[in-house]
Protein backbone atom coordinates (compact mmCIF):
# COMPACT_ATOMS: atom_id res chain seq x y z
CA UNK A 1 0.00 0.00 0.00
CA UNK A 2 1.35 3.40 -0.94
CA UNK A 3 1.18 5.76 2.00
CA UNK A 4 0.97 9.54 2.03
CA UNK A 5 3.97 11.45 3.31
CA UNK A 6 3.34 12.44 6.90
CA UNK A 7 5.15 12.78 10.18
CA UNK A 8 2.99 10.16 11.79
CA UNK A 9 5.65 8.85 14.15
CA UNK A 10 6.17 12.25 15.77
CA UNK A 11 2.42 12.78 15.97
CA UNK A 12 1.94 9.47 17.71
CA UNK A 13 4.61 10.22 20.29
CA UNK A 14 3.09 13.61 21.06
CA UNK A 15 -0.40 12.13 21.21
CA UNK A 16 0.58 9.49 23.73
CA UNK A 17 2.26 11.98 26.05
CA UNK A 18 -0.41 14.69 25.88
CA UNK A 19 -3.34 12.37 26.52
CA UNK A 20 -1.87 11.22 29.82
CA UNK A 21 -2.05 14.83 31.01
CA UNK A 22 -5.52 15.47 29.58
CA UNK A 23 -7.19 12.55 31.33
CA UNK A 24 -5.47 13.03 34.66
CA UNK A 25 -3.49 10.51 36.63
CA UNK A 26 -4.02 8.18 39.54
CA UNK A 27 -2.76 10.74 42.03
CA UNK A 28 -4.95 13.60 40.86
CA UNK A 29 -8.15 11.76 39.94
CA UNK A 30 -11.03 12.24 42.33
CA UNK A 31 -12.72 9.20 43.78
CA UNK A 32 -16.40 9.42 44.64
CA UNK A 33 -18.54 6.40 45.40
CA UNK A 34 -22.20 5.64 45.02
CA UNK A 35 -24.30 4.67 42.05
CA UNK A 36 -27.75 3.63 41.00
CA UNK A 37 -28.31 0.32 39.26
CA UNK A 38 -31.71 1.45 38.02
CA UNK A 39 -31.89 1.08 34.24
CA UNK A 40 -33.09 4.52 33.22
CA UNK A 41 -31.74 7.75 31.81
CA UNK A 42 -29.15 9.14 34.21
CA UNK A 43 -27.67 12.58 34.63
CA UNK A 44 -24.17 13.75 33.89
CA UNK A 45 -23.67 14.18 37.62
CA UNK A 46 -24.51 10.53 38.26
CA UNK A 47 -22.09 9.45 35.54
CA UNK A 48 -19.34 11.72 36.81
CA UNK A 49 -19.23 10.42 40.35
CA UNK A 50 -19.54 6.70 39.63
CA UNK A 51 -15.90 6.03 38.75
CA UNK A 52 -12.60 5.85 40.61
CA UNK A 53 -8.90 5.36 39.94
CA UNK A 54 -8.16 2.56 42.39
CA UNK A 55 -7.84 -0.34 39.97
CA UNK A 56 -4.96 -2.40 38.67
CA UNK A 57 -7.04 -4.77 36.50
CA UNK A 58 -8.66 -3.51 33.29
CA UNK A 59 -11.59 -5.65 32.12
CA UNK A 60 -12.82 -5.05 28.57
CA UNK A 61 -15.94 -6.71 27.15
CA UNK A 62 -16.41 -7.06 23.37
CA UNK A 63 -17.92 -9.46 20.83
CA UNK A 64 -14.91 -10.04 18.56
CA UNK A 65 -11.22 -9.20 18.40
CA UNK A 66 -11.40 -6.11 16.15
CA UNK A 67 -10.99 -3.58 18.96
CA UNK A 68 -8.47 -5.85 20.64
CA UNK A 69 -6.28 -5.69 17.53
CA UNK A 70 -6.52 -1.89 17.42
CA UNK A 71 -5.65 -1.65 21.11
CA UNK A 72 -2.62 -3.90 20.78
CA UNK A 73 -1.27 -2.06 17.75
CA UNK A 74 -1.96 1.58 18.60
CA UNK A 75 -2.17 1.97 22.37
CA UNK A 76 1.33 2.04 23.87
CA UNK A 77 2.69 -0.19 26.60
CA UNK A 78 0.70 -3.39 26.03
CA UNK A 79 2.32 -6.83 26.23
CA UNK A 80 0.29 -9.92 25.42
CA UNK A 81 0.12 -12.71 27.97
CA UNK A 82 0.29 -16.47 27.50
CA UNK A 83 -2.83 -16.30 25.33
CA UNK A 84 -4.83 -13.57 23.61
CA UNK A 85 -7.34 -13.25 26.45
CA UNK A 86 -4.99 -11.40 28.78
CA UNK A 87 -1.99 -9.11 28.84
CA UNK A 88 -0.17 -6.44 30.81
CA UNK A 89 -0.14 -2.70 30.29
CA UNK A 90 2.49 -0.32 31.62
CA UNK A 91 2.44 3.45 31.08
CA UNK A 92 2.56 6.71 33.01
CA UNK A 93 -0.75 5.86 34.68
CA UNK A 94 0.62 2.69 36.22
CA UNK A 95 0.87 -1.03 35.58
CA UNK A 96 -2.26 -3.01 34.83
CA UNK A 97 -3.45 -6.50 34.03
CA UNK A 98 -5.74 -6.43 30.98
CA UNK A 99 -8.46 -9.05 30.56
CA UNK A 100 -10.37 -9.45 27.29
CA UNK A 101 -13.83 -10.96 27.79
CA UNK A 102 -15.05 -11.82 24.29
CA UNK A 103 -18.62 -13.09 23.89
CA UNK A 104 -19.80 -13.62 20.29
CA UNK A 105 -22.97 -11.74 19.41
CA UNK A 106 -24.79 -14.80 17.99
CA UNK A 107 -28.34 -15.19 19.37
CA UNK A 108 -27.99 -11.97 21.36
CA UNK A 109 -25.36 -13.62 23.58
CA UNK A 110 -23.16 -10.53 23.88
CA UNK A 111 -25.98 -8.26 25.01
CA UNK A 112 -27.16 -10.96 27.40
CA UNK A 113 -23.67 -11.02 28.90
CA UNK A 114 -23.65 -7.25 29.34
CA UNK A 115 -27.12 -7.38 30.88
CA UNK A 116 -25.81 -9.92 33.36
CA UNK A 117 -22.65 -8.12 34.49
CA UNK A 118 -23.38 -4.40 34.22
CA UNK A 119 -26.13 -4.23 36.89
CA UNK A 120 -23.72 -5.90 39.35
CA UNK A 121 -20.74 -3.69 38.54
CA UNK A 122 -21.06 -1.28 41.45
CA UNK A 123 -20.79 -4.15 43.93
CA UNK A 124 -18.29 -6.27 42.01
CA UNK A 125 -14.86 -6.89 43.49
CA UNK A 126 -12.06 -4.68 42.19
CA UNK A 127 -10.60 -7.32 39.89
CA UNK A 128 -14.02 -8.27 38.48
CA UNK A 129 -15.35 -4.81 37.64
CA UNK A 130 -16.21 -4.06 34.00
CA UNK A 131 -14.16 -1.03 32.99
CA UNK A 132 -14.90 -0.75 29.27
CA UNK A 133 -17.31 -2.41 26.89
CA UNK A 134 -18.00 -2.11 23.19
CA UNK A 135 -21.41 -1.58 21.59
CA UNK A 136 -22.84 -1.41 18.07
CA UNK A 137 -25.19 1.16 16.56
CA UNK A 138 -28.04 -1.36 16.32
CA UNK A 139 -28.46 -1.44 20.09
CA UNK A 140 -26.41 1.53 21.28
CA UNK A 141 -29.35 3.45 22.75
CA UNK A 142 -30.18 0.54 25.05
CA UNK A 143 -26.96 1.20 26.96
CA UNK A 144 -26.49 4.88 26.21
CA UNK A 145 -29.83 5.68 27.89
CA UNK A 146 -28.99 3.73 31.04
CA UNK A 147 -27.04 4.19 34.23
CA UNK A 148 -24.45 1.68 33.02
CA UNK A 149 -22.47 4.09 30.82
CA UNK A 150 -20.50 7.17 31.80
CA UNK A 151 -20.42 10.64 30.27
CA UNK A 152 -17.09 10.80 28.41
CA UNK A 153 -16.68 14.45 29.37
CA UNK A 154 -16.95 13.47 33.03
CA UNK A 155 -14.07 11.09 32.34
CA UNK A 156 -11.96 13.96 31.01
CA UNK A 157 -12.54 14.25 27.26
CA UNK A 158 -13.17 17.80 26.04
CA UNK A 159 -15.14 19.38 23.21
CA UNK A 160 -11.84 20.04 21.49
CA UNK A 161 -10.89 16.36 21.78
CA UNK A 162 -14.18 15.36 20.17
CA UNK A 163 -14.31 18.07 17.50
CA UNK A 164 -12.70 16.05 14.71
CA UNK A 165 -15.19 13.18 14.76
CA UNK A 166 -18.00 12.62 12.30
CA UNK A 167 -21.12 14.08 13.91
CA UNK A 168 -23.23 10.97 13.39
CA UNK A 169 -20.79 8.88 15.44
CA UNK A 170 -21.45 11.20 18.37
CA UNK A 171 -25.20 11.24 17.81
CA UNK A 172 -25.32 7.44 18.01
CA UNK A 173 -24.05 7.55 21.60
CA UNK A 174 -25.72 10.72 22.83
CA UNK A 175 -28.11 10.03 25.71
CA UNK A 176 -31.52 11.57 26.22
CA UNK A 177 -29.97 13.97 28.73
CA UNK A 178 -27.51 15.23 26.10
CA UNK A 179 -24.41 13.54 27.49
CA UNK A 180 -22.07 11.59 25.22
CA UNK A 181 -21.69 8.00 26.46
CA UNK A 182 -19.39 6.40 23.90
CA UNK A 183 -16.79 7.16 21.25
CA UNK A 184 -15.58 5.29 18.18
CA UNK A 185 -12.31 5.08 16.29
CA UNK A 186 -14.17 4.34 13.04
CA UNK A 187 -16.93 5.63 10.81
CA UNK A 188 -18.79 3.07 8.72
CA UNK A 189 -20.28 4.34 5.45
CA UNK A 190 -21.11 1.57 3.00
CA UNK A 191 -20.14 0.86 -0.61
CA UNK A 192 -20.53 -1.97 -3.11
CA UNK A 193 -17.40 -4.13 -3.42
CA UNK A 194 -17.16 -6.04 -6.70
CA UNK A 195 -14.82 -8.49 -8.40
CA UNK A 196 -12.86 -6.70 -11.11
CA UNK A 197 -12.51 -9.82 -13.27
CA UNK A 198 -16.24 -10.55 -13.15
CA UNK A 199 -17.13 -6.92 -13.89
CA UNK A 200 -14.90 -7.05 -16.97
CA UNK A 201 -16.62 -10.21 -18.16
CA UNK A 202 -20.14 -8.91 -17.53
CA UNK A 203 -19.81 -5.18 -18.25
CA UNK A 204 -16.63 -5.00 -20.30
CA UNK A 205 -14.90 -2.79 -17.74
CA UNK A 206 -13.68 -2.89 -14.17
CA UNK A 207 -13.25 0.88 -13.84
CA UNK A 208 -15.12 2.00 -10.69
CA UNK A 209 -16.63 5.08 -12.34
CA UNK A 210 -17.95 3.05 -15.28
CA UNK A 211 -19.20 0.21 -13.09
CA UNK A 212 -21.02 2.76 -10.94
CA UNK A 213 -22.88 4.05 -14.00
CA UNK A 214 -24.26 0.54 -14.48
CA UNK A 215 -25.25 0.18 -10.81
CA UNK A 216 -26.44 3.70 -10.02
CA UNK A 217 -30.01 2.72 -9.07
CA UNK A 218 -31.94 -0.46 -8.32
CA UNK A 219 -33.37 -0.82 -11.83
CA UNK A 220 -29.85 -0.73 -13.27
CA UNK A 221 -28.60 -3.05 -10.55
CA UNK A 222 -31.34 -5.57 -11.39
CA UNK A 223 -30.45 -5.37 -15.07
CA UNK A 224 -26.81 -6.18 -14.32
CA UNK A 225 -27.97 -9.06 -12.13
CA UNK A 226 -29.68 -10.55 -15.18
CA UNK A 227 -26.54 -10.03 -17.28
CA UNK A 228 -24.41 -11.68 -14.60
CA UNK A 229 -26.76 -14.67 -14.49
CA UNK A 230 -26.45 -15.08 -18.25
CA UNK A 231 -22.66 -15.16 -17.86
CA UNK A 232 -22.81 -17.83 -15.16
CA UNK A 233 -22.42 -15.56 -12.12
CA UNK A 234 -24.51 -14.57 -9.13
CA UNK A 235 -25.09 -10.88 -8.51
CA UNK A 236 -25.18 -11.38 -4.74
CA UNK A 237 -24.23 -14.26 -2.50
CA UNK A 238 -27.27 -14.64 -0.30
CA UNK A 239 -30.52 -13.48 1.15
CA UNK A 240 -29.09 -10.86 3.50
CA UNK A 241 -26.53 -9.12 1.32
CA UNK A 242 -28.53 -6.05 0.30
CA UNK A 243 -30.45 -5.77 3.57
CA UNK A 244 -28.58 -2.82 5.05
CA UNK A 245 -29.06 -0.70 1.95
CA UNK A 246 -32.79 -0.89 2.67
CA UNK A 247 -32.89 -1.05 6.48
CA UNK A 248 -30.71 2.06 6.77
CA UNK A 249 -33.00 4.01 4.46
CA UNK A 250 -36.28 3.54 6.32
CA UNK A 251 -38.76 6.34 6.96
CA UNK A 252 -39.77 5.14 10.44
CA UNK A 253 -38.32 3.26 13.39
CA UNK A 254 -38.88 -0.43 14.07
CA UNK A 255 -40.99 0.44 17.14
CA UNK A 256 -43.53 3.24 17.48
CA UNK A 257 -44.26 5.34 20.56
CA UNK A 258 -46.77 2.74 21.78
CA UNK A 259 -44.16 -0.05 21.75
CA UNK A 260 -45.76 -1.60 18.68
CA UNK A 261 -43.55 -3.14 16.01
CA UNK A 262 -43.86 -1.60 12.55
CA UNK A 263 -42.32 -2.79 9.30
CA UNK A 264 -41.19 0.01 7.00
CA UNK A 265 -41.90 -0.05 3.26
CA UNK A 266 -38.16 -0.13 2.57
CA UNK A 267 -37.89 -3.42 4.46
CA UNK A 268 -40.66 -4.91 2.33
CA UNK A 269 -38.80 -3.73 -0.78
CA UNK A 270 -35.85 -5.81 0.38
CA UNK A 271 -38.15 -8.81 0.85
CA UNK A 272 -39.56 -8.48 -2.67
CA UNK A 273 -36.15 -7.99 -4.24
CA UNK A 274 -34.61 -10.92 -2.40
CA UNK A 275 -37.47 -13.23 -3.30
CA UNK A 276 -37.05 -12.26 -6.95
CA UNK A 277 -33.28 -12.76 -6.81
CA UNK A 278 -33.74 -16.15 -5.16
CA UNK A 279 -36.36 -17.36 -7.63
CA UNK A 280 -34.37 -16.16 -10.65
CA UNK A 281 -31.04 -17.47 -9.41
CA UNK A 282 -29.49 -14.04 -9.03
CA UNK A 283 -28.18 -14.96 -5.58
CA UNK A 284 -26.41 -18.09 -4.37
CA UNK A 285 -28.80 -18.85 -1.52
CA UNK A 286 -26.31 -18.29 1.31
CA UNK A 287 -26.88 -16.66 4.69
CA UNK A 288 -24.82 -13.87 6.20
CA UNK A 289 -21.68 -15.13 7.98
CA UNK A 290 -22.09 -18.79 7.02
CA UNK A 291 -19.28 -20.80 5.43
CA UNK A 292 -20.75 -20.72 1.92
CA UNK A 293 -21.17 -16.95 2.10
CA UNK A 294 -17.52 -16.57 3.13
CA UNK A 295 -16.40 -18.98 0.40
CA UNK A 296 -18.20 -16.85 -2.21
CA UNK A 297 -15.67 -14.10 -1.41
CA UNK A 298 -12.75 -16.37 -2.26
CA UNK A 299 -11.05 -17.51 -5.44
CA UNK A 300 -13.68 -20.15 -6.20
CA UNK A 301 -16.55 -17.70 -5.80
CA UNK A 302 -18.80 -16.70 -8.69
CA UNK A 303 -20.41 -13.65 -7.07
CA UNK A 304 -20.28 -10.22 -8.72
CA UNK A 305 -20.12 -8.28 -5.47
CA UNK A 306 -20.98 -7.61 -1.84
CA UNK A 307 -22.41 -4.65 0.04
CA UNK A 308 -19.86 -3.80 2.70
CA UNK A 309 -19.07 -0.90 4.96
CA UNK A 310 -15.57 0.09 5.94
CA UNK A 311 -14.76 -2.65 8.44
CA UNK A 312 -16.16 -5.30 6.09
CA UNK A 313 -13.61 -4.60 3.39
CA UNK A 314 -10.48 -4.67 5.50
CA UNK A 315 -11.65 -6.98 8.29
CA UNK A 316 -13.79 -9.56 6.46
CA UNK A 317 -13.56 -9.40 2.68
CA UNK A 318 -9.78 -9.20 2.59
CA UNK A 319 -9.40 -12.23 4.82
CA UNK A 320 -11.92 -14.28 2.87
CA UNK A 321 -10.17 -13.47 -0.41
CA UNK A 322 -6.90 -15.16 0.58
CA UNK A 323 -6.16 -18.76 -0.37
CA UNK A 324 -3.39 -18.91 2.22
CA UNK A 325 -4.76 -17.37 5.39
CA UNK A 326 -1.32 -17.31 6.97
CA UNK A 327 0.40 -16.05 3.84
CA UNK A 328 1.34 -12.53 2.87
CA UNK A 329 -1.47 -10.20 1.91
CA UNK A 330 -0.44 -9.49 -1.66
CA UNK A 331 -1.40 -10.07 -5.28
CA UNK A 332 -1.03 -13.77 -6.02
CA UNK A 333 -2.56 -14.94 -2.75
CA UNK A 334 -6.10 -15.86 -3.74
CA UNK A 335 -7.95 -12.98 -5.33
CA UNK A 336 -6.16 -10.22 -3.45
CA UNK A 337 -6.18 -7.25 -5.84
CA UNK A 338 -9.21 -8.44 -7.83
CA UNK A 339 -11.61 -6.20 -5.92
CA UNK A 340 -12.79 -2.61 -6.30
CA UNK A 341 -15.56 -0.49 -4.81
CA UNK A 342 -18.20 1.90 -6.10
CA UNK A 343 -21.09 3.78 -4.50
CA UNK A 344 -23.77 1.33 -5.61
CA UNK A 345 -27.51 2.03 -5.89
CA UNK A 346 -28.09 3.52 -2.42
CA UNK A 347 -26.20 5.30 0.34
CA UNK A 348 -26.09 3.42 3.64
CA UNK A 349 -23.98 2.59 6.65
CA UNK A 350 -23.44 -0.67 8.46
CA UNK A 351 -22.19 -1.30 11.94
CA UNK A 352 -19.41 0.42 13.77
CA UNK A 353 -18.05 -0.11 17.26
CA UNK A 354 -18.24 2.35 20.14
CA UNK A 355 -16.16 2.31 23.31
CA UNK A 356 -18.12 2.88 26.52
CA UNK A 357 -16.85 3.42 30.04
CA UNK A 358 -18.77 1.27 32.49
CA UNK A 359 -20.31 2.92 35.52
CA UNK A 360 -18.41 1.64 38.52
CA UNK A 361 -15.05 1.39 36.76
CA UNK A 362 -12.06 1.78 39.03
CA UNK A 363 -9.80 2.80 36.12
CA UNK A 364 -11.32 6.15 35.18
CA UNK A 365 -8.17 7.90 33.96
CA UNK A 366 -6.92 4.88 32.03
CA UNK A 367 -10.24 4.45 30.23
CA UNK A 368 -10.23 8.14 29.34
CA UNK A 369 -6.68 7.90 28.02
CA UNK A 370 -7.51 4.87 25.87
CA UNK A 371 -10.48 6.71 24.38
CA UNK A 372 -8.40 9.81 23.69
CA UNK A 373 -5.50 8.01 22.03
CA UNK A 374 -7.57 5.68 19.87
CA UNK A 375 -10.46 7.96 18.88
CA UNK A 376 -9.46 11.63 19.17
CA UNK A 377 -6.07 12.04 17.51
CA UNK A 378 -5.74 12.69 13.77
CA UNK A 379 -2.26 11.17 13.52
CA UNK A 380 -3.40 7.92 15.14
CA UNK A 381 -6.45 7.85 12.86
CA UNK A 382 -4.23 8.31 9.81
CA UNK A 383 -1.88 5.56 10.93
CA UNK A 384 -4.73 3.09 11.51
CA UNK A 385 -6.14 3.72 8.03
CA UNK A 386 -2.76 3.51 6.34
CA UNK A 387 -1.96 0.24 8.08
CA UNK A 388 -5.34 -1.50 7.99
CA UNK A 389 -7.52 0.25 5.36
CA UNK A 390 -10.14 0.87 8.06
CA UNK A 391 -12.00 4.17 7.73
CA UNK A 392 -11.34 6.11 10.89
CA UNK A 393 -13.42 8.65 12.75
CA UNK A 394 -11.52 11.83 12.00
CA UNK A 395 -12.78 14.09 9.25
CA UNK A 396 -9.48 15.94 8.81
CA UNK A 397 -7.44 12.75 8.53
CA UNK A 398 -9.82 11.07 6.10
CA UNK A 399 -10.17 14.14 3.87
CA UNK A 400 -6.38 14.34 3.66
CA UNK A 401 -6.09 10.67 2.66
CA UNK A 402 -8.96 11.05 0.18
CA UNK A 403 -7.09 13.87 -1.59
CA UNK A 404 -3.72 12.10 -1.50
CA UNK A 405 -2.03 9.43 -3.63
CA UNK A 406 -3.09 6.78 -1.12
CA UNK A 407 -3.77 3.45 -2.79
CA UNK A 408 -5.09 0.07 -1.69
CA UNK A 409 -3.30 -2.87 -3.25
CA UNK A 410 -6.18 -5.10 -2.18
CA UNK A 411 -8.53 -2.95 -4.27
CA UNK A 412 -6.29 -2.96 -7.33
CA UNK A 413 -4.69 0.41 -6.59
CA UNK A 414 -7.93 2.26 -5.88
CA UNK A 415 -8.19 5.05 -3.31
CA UNK A 416 -11.37 3.83 -1.66
CA UNK A 417 -11.04 6.41 1.10
CA UNK A 418 -12.18 9.06 -1.38
CA UNK A 419 -15.46 7.20 -1.96
CA UNK A 420 -15.97 6.54 1.73
CA UNK A 421 -15.40 10.23 2.50
CA UNK A 422 -18.28 11.15 0.21
CA UNK A 423 -20.50 8.33 1.47
CA UNK A 424 -19.93 9.36 5.09
CA UNK A 425 -21.61 12.70 4.40
CA UNK A 426 -24.85 10.90 3.49
CA UNK A 427 -25.26 8.78 6.62
CA UNK A 428 -28.69 9.22 8.21
CA UNK A 429 -29.35 7.67 11.61
CA UNK A 430 -32.57 9.52 12.39
CA UNK A 431 -34.59 6.29 12.55
CA UNK A 432 -32.16 4.28 14.64
CA UNK A 433 -33.63 2.62 17.73
CA UNK A 434 -32.62 0.40 20.66
CA UNK A 435 -34.26 -2.73 19.24
CA UNK A 436 -32.61 -2.64 15.83
CA UNK A 437 -30.19 -5.55 16.14
CA UNK A 438 -32.68 -8.02 17.55
CA UNK A 439 -35.50 -7.08 15.18
CA UNK A 440 -33.24 -6.98 12.13
CA UNK A 441 -31.95 -10.47 12.91
CA UNK A 442 -35.40 -11.89 13.69
CA UNK A 443 -36.89 -10.44 10.52
CA UNK A 444 -34.11 -11.75 8.31
CA UNK A 445 -34.37 -15.16 9.95
CA UNK A 446 -38.13 -15.38 9.53
CA UNK A 447 -38.04 -14.30 5.88
CA UNK A 448 -35.46 -16.93 4.97
CA UNK A 449 -38.19 -19.58 5.07
CA UNK A 450 -40.22 -17.47 2.65
CA UNK A 451 -37.30 -17.01 0.28
CA UNK A 452 -36.68 -20.76 0.17
CA UNK A 453 -40.35 -21.51 -0.46
CA UNK A 454 -41.06 -23.23 2.84
CA UNK A 455 -43.73 -20.77 4.00
CA UNK A 456 -45.84 -17.96 2.58
CA UNK A 457 -44.94 -14.32 3.07
CA UNK A 458 -47.83 -13.91 5.53
CA UNK A 459 -46.71 -16.89 7.59
CA UNK A 460 -43.14 -15.59 7.62
CA UNK A 461 -44.39 -12.24 8.88
CA UNK A 462 -46.36 -13.94 11.66
CA UNK A 463 -43.28 -15.95 12.63
CA UNK A 464 -41.31 -12.73 12.85
CA UNK A 465 -43.78 -11.10 15.22
CA UNK A 466 -43.82 -14.20 17.39
CA UNK A 467 -40.02 -14.30 17.61
CA UNK A 468 -39.83 -10.55 18.19
CA UNK A 469 -42.16 -10.43 21.20
CA UNK A 470 -40.45 -13.47 22.68
CA UNK A 471 -37.13 -11.66 22.39
CA UNK A 472 -38.57 -8.35 23.60
CA UNK A 473 -41.58 -9.00 25.88
CA UNK A 474 -42.17 -5.27 26.28
CA UNK A 475 -43.06 -4.95 22.58
CA UNK A 476 -46.38 -5.61 20.87
CA UNK A 477 -47.20 -7.10 17.51
CA UNK A 478 -49.64 -5.00 15.46
CA UNK A 479 -53.28 -6.03 15.76
Segment roles from a protein language model:
Residues 6-9, 18, 23-141, 382-385, ...:
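Conserved N-terminal structural module of periplasmic/extracytoplasmic solute-binding proteins
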Residues 44-49, 92, 108, 122, ...:
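Hinge/lid segment of periplasmic solute-binding proteins
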Residues 56, 119, 279, 324-393:
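Extracytoplasmic/periplasmic substrate-recognition and gating elements
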Residues 102-116, 216-220, 285-299:
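Short helix-initiation/N-cap motifs at beta->coil->alpha
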Residues 140-144, 310-333:
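A ligand-binding cleft/hinge motif common to bilobed small-molecule-binding domains
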Residues 175-192, 216-262, 266-269, 303:
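Extracytoplasmic/periplasmic solute-binding protein
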Residues 220-229, 257-291, 329-330, 335-340:
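Glycine-centered hinge/linker elements that transmit conformational signals in sensory
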Residues 396-412, 417-479:
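Conserved C-terminal helix/tail region of periplasmic/extracytoplasmic solute-binding proteins
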Amino acid sequence: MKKIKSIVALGLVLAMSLTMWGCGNKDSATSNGGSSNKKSSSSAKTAEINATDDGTVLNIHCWNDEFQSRFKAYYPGYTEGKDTSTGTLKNDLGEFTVNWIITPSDDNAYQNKLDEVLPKNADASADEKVDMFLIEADYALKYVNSDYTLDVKALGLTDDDLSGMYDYTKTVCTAEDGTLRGVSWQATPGLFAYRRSIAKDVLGTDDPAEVQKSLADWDKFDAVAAQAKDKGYYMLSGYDDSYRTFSNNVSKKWVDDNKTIQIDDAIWQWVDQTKTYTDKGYNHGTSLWDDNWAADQGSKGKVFGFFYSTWGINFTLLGNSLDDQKGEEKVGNGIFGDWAVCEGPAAYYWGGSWICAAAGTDNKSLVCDIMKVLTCDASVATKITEDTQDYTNNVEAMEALAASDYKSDFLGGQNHIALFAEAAKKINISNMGPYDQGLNESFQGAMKDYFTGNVSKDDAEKAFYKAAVEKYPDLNAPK
